[in-house]
Structures are given as structure tokens and as C-alpha cells.
Amino acid sequence: MRPEPDKDWSKFWWLEPDVTFLNHGAFGACPKPVLEVQQQFRLRLEQQPLRFLAQDLEGLLDSVRQVLAEFVGADPLDLVFVSNATTGINTVLRSLHFTPDDELLTTNHEYNACRNALDFVAARSGAQVVVAEIPLPIQSPQQVIEAVVAKISPKTRLALLDHVTSQTGLVMPIQALVRELSQRGIDTLIDGAHAPGTIPLSLPTIGATYYTGNCHKWLCAPKGAAFLYVQRDRQAQIRPLTISHGANSPRTDRSRFRLEFDWPGTYDPSAYLSVPTAIEFLGGLLPGGWPELMARNRAKALAARKVLCEALNVSPPCPDEMIAALAVVPLPDGSYQALQTSLLNQYGIEVPIVPWPGGQKRLVRVAAQIYNTVSQYEYLAQALVKLLAAEAG
């Protein structure tokens, strides 16, 4: 699909008009109508806190869970809310018990925060972290599968894998990876931070033991909205990071899984409660709904990559099939901090320059949301050409 013609979708967001914002992938950005709904929930909470939290909230969360479950193709009984995908990863890792005989498998593309969580539980238990080295540039998703499978051993207990890598923007062949691991009796924990809203999801089809994803990134919900999916037969093992009233609730009409996660103590649930509005709003912007939005954003990311590669005279570091709404382009070696700062201060461009310690020392990572335009990527390309020329002297 061709990227859509430039159109002022940005009017629905509060983004600063004098900044060329090409970093939706960092924290997302919430549209004005969704923020208005969030504020309505906050007002309801403050008008009658007891009624809202003690009586209304449970039913409201169940309604949200139903909408979200339909979007990710899951049973609502298998979903709970967490504040972000990093929390989801920590929740699972710190609920499980490992031994010095266990190996925890991940890749060199794993998100730093989640890798830190993996290292933490490994250090605490004596387990070993094993890293599969996935090359960049990469020619095929098959290379990912081969790299991961090569690191499997009889000691491999769990694999922590990104669905879409954060630093490098690669769509991993996650269903094939889960299949390879599951066939060997290895549990899988998938960091889907960037997947909801960029890739059509059916969590049971993917087959991961555990899957967590953000709603505040590509679904454009308010900050602090994410979910954790746990296969039914593993839910008794997974406990929230905060143990509260649900731990000894006498209720039998709801699973312990829901009772514990739905009430972590007093909190503001408005971000979770706004998720259906975000899904409806984004899905209503184009005639083809979410499928068209995801396809257009992907086409826009590919167009952005083409613009940058041609301007910088470099080759794309991965095949088109491994792109969703993020794309990276290699840059000459140099300071990533200085270049990112110069882009913002001199050109008003907010875009991450990623330090990549493999085959490419620096990458520029662009995001493609509906409010972005191809002309913005052309402007970025022009700025990079000038700044890189200045670096080279």
C-alpha cells in the first residue's frame, strides 16, 4: 500500500507544532478526544471516590478488558492490566522461580529495561542468561530463528523475546520462534511493547506462555495503560508486583488472577478505562479502520526509510517484511547524543539516534503514525545530510 497523501491529522493531538515529532515509538501520544474521556473518568473518581473505586470500577474494567481482548484476539479471562510492558515483564519474571541449573534465553536486541529485569532475576537465583546474537544488517527472518535455536540447551527454561525490537525496529518471526521453543518444552515471555496497533494480533495463535503489550504507544491510550496475557494454566503462578486485598479475598466468582491484578491498592485507573475510546478513535480515522491504519503506517515507515537511505547513500538494514511502524537506517560512526541534540536544537526534529554496538555504531530510528508525513522524513534527511557533513569536516 502506498503511504497516504499528506494530511493534517496532527490537529487531533496536542503535539507542539514547532517540533517535527518522529518518535511516537518512545511513549506514544494521546489524541485530544481520548484525553477528554480520561478527564471525565478522573472527575467521576473525585466526585464520589467510594462509589467509583469500590462499586463501579470492577464492571468498568471488565468492559475495557472485553474490548481489548477482542482487539488482541484473546479471551478476556486471560488478560489483566499493568501500567506498561516493562511492568508486565517484571511481573512474570519475579513470579517465577529459577535455579542455578536454569538458562534464560534472550537476544542482543532485547529492550534494555527488560534485559535488566532478566539479569536481576538471574543474579538472584543463580540462573544464567544466554544471549542469541542476531545480526544487523539482517537478510531474512530465518536468521533470527536460527540464531535463537542455536542457543537452546537442555537447561533452557524461559525465553524472553521482543515482538518488535525497540532499538532496531525489527518485527521478529515471533510465532515461529514460539513454536520452536514450545516444541522443546520451553516457556516464552514476549515483550510486545510495540506490537498492539502496528501488527494484527491473535495472542492464542502466537501461542506464547506470557505476552505483555502497551496500549499507550500505538493504540494512543493515555500513559500508563498496558496488558499482561497469561495462559490459563499458568495464572496461579503469576502474582502482581504489589500484593493487596485480592490475595486473600473470599470471593469465588472471579479468578484469583483477576482479583489480585484488578486491585493493587488505591490508584487512578483512568488510563485503563480510556483504552476503548482510543481503539475506537484511531480505528475510526480511516475508512478501512485499524487494518488500513496499520497498513498505511507501515507503508509510511517504508517510505521514510527509502527517503533516508537514498539521501545518505546506504542500504536498508533489514528486509521489508521485518518492518511495521518503526524503521532504522545506519549512520556513520559518531556521538549519538550530540547528533540527536543537534537535530532537536538546530532543526526542531525529535527523533532518536540509537547507539548500536554491532555492525552499525549509530542508527536513526523513525516512527510512522497517522499524523506524520513523508515531507517530515524528507526534512529529516536534509538535516542529517548537513549535520553529518559538518561532523565529517
Question: What is each model feature region?
Answer:
Residues 1-393:
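Pyridoxal 5′-phosphate
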